[in-house]
């Protein structure tokens, strides 16, 4: 569950970045930092980002950027809600 789905999220992110002519490599330090945190904290405590804070402005901007890919937009909404509910 954790690794298989995480890798799929990387693949989806790569598609989005490629569409905007941004190399996936810009994500590597963030991916590394996120993975490192679970060595030091329980995963729920290591969670950061707009979903855990329920930052509607950022979430809505992200959803707007995904407007042309409704399947990713729906996935983003569902995962964001799941992250927020874990608080």
Show where each model-derived region lies.
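NAD(P)-dependent Rossmann-like dehydrogenase/reductase catalytic/cofactor-binding core
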Residues: 25-87
